[in-house]
Amino acid sequence: MTIEDYRIEFGWSKSKLCKEADIEMNTLQRAIDGSPIFRATAGKIVGAINQELARRGRPSIRYTDLEGVVFAD
């Protein structure tokens, strides 16, 4: 699944995901658009996703599981 798939499934706005992941909106947009992001940033996004997955009783994911994410490092 992509970042957007998770965001939409959770009913989160982009602002909500940014807040949960402690990242800036432009960083999130770059990740969604397929521009390179650092693995640490992907880790923050996945951390936010995993918290919600855990709340829903679902298994966690790794940043390498996110479709469409390009790493800068």
Walk through the language-model features, giving the residues of each.
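A short, Lys/Arg-rich alpha-helix, primarily the initiator
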Residues: M1-E20, G47, R56-E67
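Short, charged recognition helix plus adjacent turn
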Residues: I8, M25, R30, A40, ...
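Residue-level detector of alpha-helix boundaries and kinks
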Residues: S13, R30-A31
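Positions that flank functional sites
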Residues: D22, D33
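Short, basic-rich loop-to-helix N-cap that marks the start of a DNA-contacting helix
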Residues: G34-G47
